[in-house]
Amino acid sequence: YNLAVERINKMGGVEVDGKKYKFEIIYYDDESNSGRAAQLAERLIKQDGVKYMLGPYSSGLTKAMAPVTEKYKIPMVEANGASRSLFTKGYKYLFAVLAPANVYLDVAIDLAVEKNGGKPVKIAQAFEQDAFSQDVRLGILDAAKRTGSNIIIDDKLPKELNDMASTLAKVKATKPDVLVVSGHTK
């Protein structure tokens, strides 16, 4: 963001209704805590007077901030929150630059079916239980249904994952054509 703001400001800023505006980035550490993110969004709007917001990292934090930006009619452009649920709530001031998470990996199933001569494939999947990962999972389920493929493993990963031996043992025993895993680095 800093590079973009620097360049835009060097070129004179942005013109709106015949008036030029320069950008300034103000940010705080939300500590990856959704309550804190909502609180800081309110602070940015009410105390710092921001008129435009760049979204936080993750669907969870975006989900916490969106009601605040909606309340104050502040546009928020989101580059890191992709949970489908963000875009089904009717928000008027939330804009995204990426596709929703449910379409992230569905094409992998289409490709696997294509590589398998157009025949359905066996799919193993393991997902964390957060909104983003569950939306990716729903996309895989939709792709499996659409292609006639079978989900042979559908594991839920714990938030504090230290060992995937159980899931990997199932994968080894069932020999799926595709393994899809979605989670987050800690």
Model-found features: residue ranges?
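Extracytoplasmic "Venus flytrap"
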Residues: 1-3, 28-34, 57-58, 126-135
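Loop/turn elements at helix/coil->beta-strand transitions in domains of secreted/extracellular proteins
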Residues: 21-24, 47-52, 71-76, 90-93, ...
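An alpha-beta-alpha
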Residues: 92-159, 178
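Acidic side chains
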Residues: 9, 29-30, 48, 128-130, ...
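Signal peptide-proximal N-terminal region
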Residues: 2-25, 118, 145-148
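Beta-alpha junction/loop-to-helix N-cap segments that form part of ligand/metal-binding clefts
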Residues: 14-88, 97, 157-164, 184-186
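Solvent-exposed, polar/charged alpha-helical surfaces in well-ordered, non-transmembrane soluble domains
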Residues: 2-6, 10, 35-46, 51-52, ...
